[in-house]
């Protein structure tokens, strides 16, 4: 307990008795969006204090005046050192920081999906045992579809994420504990003391005061314009602009333009533009000063009064402050007998201003960039072989993601680069579950992965053994939900050049006009079942050599008009049983030299010398009857199956589509064409 008179500093460390240490001096640095840093010079009658009783233990510094508590600061001991020892006292040095500081000791890479920023921050805090935190948020913060902590400490990630969302944080202190408060508007600040401006003729007994106050204005960017791109709305600009206030003392032409703005929807774009402007102008109107009020701290405002410049007699908020205290009488052996003194130096902005951290400053580090492409594996739900969405995007498992379960929750939907991509034309090859892919990152941003390549590895081997088949260029697929494959292969070995096609089931070819084949050597066709061909016009066949056909069953030929046959030499027909010719009108058989009909030993021979009939008996109009044939019993051919006809893209409707070009709704490639025609975008 402190004395009832004067200024005094006391400290309590862990479970050690309260009188273990006396405070010789301290320095406390506090700022918005930074863990505070308390440095203590202590003295103790014990020369051998157990370090285990101090390090990583709670520590509380109290500032008293006339027995009344003025300020409390509590945190955890991050650094402890023993200094010089005398006859009665040993000096020690302590470093005290908030529990939030522990996040700086752990670097990680992990993925957060479909969570609001405050939910992400809560997870990080709770994982480090921090339960005393609060969110005093005025604005709505959208869920982040995909947010990566990438090779950065938890503290850097917290600072960066808070700054990106326009949040700032500060600490509040209670008995034995401290709370971190995240806010996004100056309305969350608490009202602090009223401090008069002391021209030098008033003492502390008359109340805490400000003994120095400097006012400053600086030229800063006047407005911000951010722009981004979304493949879901490719023709929409996603551009947002915000103009600063209080520009009367500077030009309004200092625009800060940036792309990408790190957003994909308008509400986030508008908010991010305002956050960027506030951060760039966070010291455009500012003040600094010195006071003796230990109650001042970030997250508070104070009212300045009695300043000769009346415009400065207003409410200010603390952005940063450095407290210094000296208690000389704690060092008895060194003749310490001076008074206990305290003072601080502070930086402020107007209380109505919402201060936001500038990205790239100590309060908000830049987002880590991915140095180059990475390897990942395509993943999806159990039992699936191919898993994608309507845009052909896939889910990935990165080797560094220790939290992913190699399923459809491992990442966001990730776009896949194709060899050619137009409006309903181009190439499409969906990486399948288990495939290894090369992932690039737009602008090096870990939040924006895109698959740009595919690679084999030790278990996913190439289709053919290498390097034995190094001359082969192969496109081989794998049957989905079954066994088999389709393949297109090119062999480039000299003397063995080949194009090979394998289809696991069907081959369908649709040619809208002509098809020409020129085979300079042999063609071999082997069909295990039927061949069905339909020609809607004419069929022309020229064989310059020999033609041989063998039909092991029946052969049906139906000609709706005439059949013309012309042979240069002989027509030789042999039937095992019967040859039957039937004509509806007449049959004419004409020979230049001889015509013979022969059955057994009987025959009729007609030649230029006459007609010769020979037989066992010759009957002329004396009974008997003609023989009959089997008659025509041929089969009509079946018709070929239909080939799938893929419809071309629908025609454009300019009146409707031009009207939507500049909307935030998704548009198609046809709209993109119109945008180029209209000069829009």
From Swiss-Prot:
User: In what ranges is there compositional bias, type Polar residues?
Assistant: 289-309
Which family, according to UniProt?
Belongs to the VgrG protein family.
Pfam name, any one: Phage_GPD
Q: What is this protein called?
A: Type VI secretion system spike protein VgrG2
**Annotated stretches, region: Disordered:** 284-309
Task: Please state the gene responsible for encoding this protein.
Answer: vgrG2
Summarize what gene deletion causes: Deletion positively influences motility while it has a negative effect on biofilm formation.
Instruction: Supply the SUPFAM superfamilies for this chain.
Output: gp5 N-terminal domain-like, Phage fibre proteins, Phage tail proteins
Q: Which domain of life is it from?
A: Bacteria
Functional note:
Part of the type VI secretion system specialized secretion system, which delivers several virulence factors in both prokaryotic and eukaryotic cells during infection. Plays an essential role in bacterial mobility and biofilm formation.
């Amino acid at each position: 307990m402190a004395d009832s008179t004067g200024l005094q500093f006391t400290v309590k460390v862990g479970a050690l008795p309260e009188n273990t240490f006396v405070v010789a001096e301290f320095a406390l640095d506090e700022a918005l969006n930074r863990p505070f840093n308390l440095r203590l010079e202590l003295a103790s009658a014990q020369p051998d204090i157990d370090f285990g009783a101090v390090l990583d233990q709670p520590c509380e510094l109290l500032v008293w005046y006339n027995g009344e508590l003025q300020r409390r600061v509590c945190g955890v001991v991050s650094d402890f050192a023993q200094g010089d020892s005398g006859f009665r006292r040993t000096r020690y040095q302590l470093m005290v920081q908030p529990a939030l500081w522990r996040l700086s000791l752990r670097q990680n890479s992990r993925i957060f999906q479909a969570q609001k920023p405050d939910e992400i921050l809560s997870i990080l805090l709770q994982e480090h045992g921090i339960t005393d935190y609060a969110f005093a948020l005025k604005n709505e913060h959208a869920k982040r579809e995909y947010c990566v902590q990438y090779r950065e400490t938890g503290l850097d990630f917290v600072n960066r994420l808070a700054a990106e969302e326009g949040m700032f944080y500060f600490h509040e202190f209670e008995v034995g504990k401290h709370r971190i408060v995240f806010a996004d508007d100056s309305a969350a600040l608490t009202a602090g003391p009223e401090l008069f401006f002391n021209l030098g003729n008033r003492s502390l007994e008359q109340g805490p005061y400000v003994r120095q106050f400097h006012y400053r204005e600086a030229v800063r960017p006047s407005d911000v314009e951010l722009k981004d791109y979304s493949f879901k709305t490719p023709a929409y600009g996603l551009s947002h602009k915000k103009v600063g206030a209080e520009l009367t003392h500077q030009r309004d032409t200092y625009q800060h333009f940036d792309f990408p703005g790190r957003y994909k929807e308008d509400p986030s774009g508008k908010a991010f533009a305002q956050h960027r402007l506030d951060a760039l102008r966070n010291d455009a109107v500012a003040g600094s000063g010195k006071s003796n009020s230990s109650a001042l701290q970030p997250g508070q405002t104070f009212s300045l009064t009695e300043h000769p410049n009346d415009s400065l007699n207003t409410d200010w908020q603390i952005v940063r402050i450095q407290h210094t205290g000296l208690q000389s009488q704690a060092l008895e052996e060194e003749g310490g007998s001076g008074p206990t003194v305290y003072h601080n130096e502070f930086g402020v902005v107007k209380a109505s201003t919402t201060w936001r951290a500038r990205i790239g400053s100590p309060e908000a580090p830049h987002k880590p960039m991915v140095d180059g492409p990475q390897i990942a594996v395509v993943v999806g739900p159990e039992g699936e072989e191919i898993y994608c969405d309507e845009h052909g995007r896939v889910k990935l498992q990165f080797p560094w993601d220790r939290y992913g379960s190699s399923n459809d929750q491992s990442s966001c939907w990730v776009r896949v680069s194709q060899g050619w991509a137009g409006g309903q034309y181009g190439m499409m090859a969906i990486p399948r579950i288990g495939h290894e892919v090369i992932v690039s990152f737009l602008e090096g941003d870990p939040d924006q992965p895109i698959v740009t390549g595919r690679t084999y590895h030790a278990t996913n081997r190439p289709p053919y053994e290498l390097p034995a088949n190094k001359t082969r260029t192969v496109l081989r697929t794998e049957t989905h939900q079954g066994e088999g494959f389709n393949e297109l292969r090119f062999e480039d070995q000299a003397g063995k050049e080949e194009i090979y096609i394998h289809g696991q089931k069907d081959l369908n070819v649709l040619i809208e006009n002509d098809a020409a084949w020129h085979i300079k050597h042999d063609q071999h066709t082997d069909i295990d079942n039927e061949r069905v061909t339909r020609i809607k016009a004419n069929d022309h066949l020229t064989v310059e050599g020999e033609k041989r056909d063998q039909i092991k069953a029946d052969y049906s030929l139906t000609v709706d008009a005439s059949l013309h046959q012309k042979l240069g030499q002989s027509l030789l027909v042999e039937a095992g049983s019967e040859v039957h010719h039937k004509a509806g009108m007449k049959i004419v058989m004409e020979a230049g030299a001889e015509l013979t009909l022969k059955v057994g030993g009987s025959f009729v021979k007609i030649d230029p010398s006459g007609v010769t009939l020979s037989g066992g008996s010759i009957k002329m109009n004396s009974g008997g009857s003609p023989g009959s044939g089997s008659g025509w019993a041929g089969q009509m051919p079946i018709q070929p199956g239909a080939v799938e006809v893929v419809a071309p893209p629908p025609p454009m409707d300019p009146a409707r589509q031009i009207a939507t070009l500049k909307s935030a709704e998704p548009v198609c490639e046809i709209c993109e064409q119109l945008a180029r025609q209209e000069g829009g975008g």
